[in-house]
């Protein structure tokens, strides 16, 4: 969008999980920071949504106060009219909320989007994704469908608006003292929600199979099921024990790291002298923010040669990225 000088500010509604501790929450806050840098052009409003079972950010800082003020301003916007919307979600939730609508999504973590995403995506004027891999998912999502009115087959059913990849920026933080009480000197780190896509169960299983005889190797699992509560911690611990109980004679260690951590604490985790590599064996990533963060903090990464992380990871034995 190009807005000419001298015009009134454009009222933009940002709809997304801006206050949640989730990947889409990070996307929403990234978008808001970008818009904040152009407050001479945009009059910003926020519709803050939930994101599944994910928890909410608790930091009481200047950025949180600013987002809260935008939410309050939106509630008091009685006419409810906006010049454009930025909708941060999965495409099946996209709606026409303004004359100009932009969808901002991580896309799909596999090779092509669902046909059910096409119609709502075509309500948008433009789509923003997190990676070239995410863009390919839209490019590959071309289907043959049946016209419900005529019964005729229609080929080439696809997303029409342009799809533009925009990755996350580097956000380095100063570390803080972090007492992990590690009993092992060489430790792998995995940062993953305990769910099928992240493949955490197999990550732990394969670690135990490989290092069961090495008493100086550990795996730190920064994980949760859906939040940061005590109940969530107990359930996460139970899931880990379901795997580790099958290796009662293993000499290696599996550590559970649970609960909210600040950007400074995560920086200390990535740079901890006893943390030697990040491991991610997920089935697919819309972007892979922990992989990206580990990379820019200089922590070696072990992951698969497929999905969005190949946008920013380079393997010397392969051509390209």
Region roles according to the model:
Residues 300-303, 320:
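Short hydrophobic beta-strand element within catalytic cores of glycosyltransferases
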Residues 5-10, 172-187, 212-214:
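Nucleotide-sugar donor-binding and catalytic loop/hinge architecture
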Residues 8-82, 218:
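N-terminal pre-catalytic "stem/leader" segment of glycosyltransferase-like enzymes
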Residues 13-15, 53-139:
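Extended catalytic core of nucleotide-activated donor transferases of GT-like folds
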Residues 268-289, 296-299:
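Acidic donor-binding loop of glycosyltransferase active sites
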Residues 227-277, 319:
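Nucleotide-activated donor-binding/catalytic signature segment of Leloir-type glycosyltransferases, i.e.
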